Design a protein with these regions (language model features):
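A structural signal for leucine-rich repeat
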Residues: 85, 107-108, 129, 135-136, ...
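Structural signature of tandem-repeat unit edges
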Residues: 1-13, 19-38, 44-57, 67-78, ...
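Low-complexity, Pro/Thr/Ser/Gly/Ala-rich linker/spacer regions in secreted
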Residues: 198-207
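Short, aromatic/basic amphipathic alpha-helical patches
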Residues: 156-163, 180-193
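Alpha-helical elements of the RecA-like P-loop NTPase motor core of helicases
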Residues: 82, 135, 180-183
Length: 207
């Protein structure tokens, strides 16, 4: 396995695009990087694992087209400004502090992604005047967990289009106290039949 060690605070725009490293690096694990800029790992087809302990900012298309990427972990990231679009092998997503997904195609076509747990997320969308396809064509996505006791706002109903959730075979797990609020919400109501209470499914939701 190839490993590349960074000693800088920011990975800049197009950092590895078209580079020799792009074709060979499989793992990036770093405790110092805080920003991953636009297109930094764009099309890094060999990349399998990214763990950024102190990353607080990821930018547009920074991981788009990383077709071997299976695991990402950003423990302190709060705002999703980057893309994992077309990361077709992505299965393990660890974003425990994420509060806001505000990129139009954040996880679009992550076809291997079956489950995503967003404990603190309170907003998904790019504004009410724009379509949002954050999980569009995530064809394996059957489990979305929104644990926050504050209802997660949704700007556009297209966020789960062409997923098992939109087709009636996937589910969104939220606190029992918020079930009716989600089902009555102007946008979330499209998925009204797919809501389940976290408390009723410990085998799926844990905690």
């Amino acid at each position: 396995m190839s490993e590349y060690t960074y000693t800088v605070d920011v990975i800049g725009d197009d950092a590895l695009t078209d580079s020799v490293i792009m074709k060979t690096v499989t793992e990036v694990i770093d405790q110092h990087i805080n920003t991953i800029s636009e297109y930094a790992f764009y099309g890094c087809a060999a990349l399998q694992t990214v763990i950024g302990t102190n990353v607080t900012s990821i930018r547009s298309d920074c991981f788009t087209g990383c077709t071997s990427l299976e695991t990402v972990s950003f423990p302190v990231l709060k705002v999703m400004d980057g893309y994992f679009r077309n990361c077709t092998a992505l299965k393990n997503v660890d974003l425990p502090q994420l509060k806001d997904i505000r990129k139009q195609y954040a996880f679009e076509k992550c076809t291997a992604l079956e489950r995503i747990d967003l404990p603190l997320c309170t907003h998904i969308g790019v504004g009410t005047n724009y379509s949002c396809y954050a999980f569009h064509y995530c064809s394996s996505l059957t489990t979305v967990i929104l644990r926050s006791e504050t209802m997660c706002s949704l700007d556009d109903i297209s966020v789960f289009s062409d997923t098992p959730i939109s087709k009636g075979t996937g589910y969104i797990y939220v606190p029992q106290a918020l079930i009716e609020s989600y089902q009555a919400h102007e946008k979330w109501s499209v998925y009204a039949n797919q809501f389940r209470a976290i408390e009723d499914y410990p085998e799926i939701c844990g905690q």
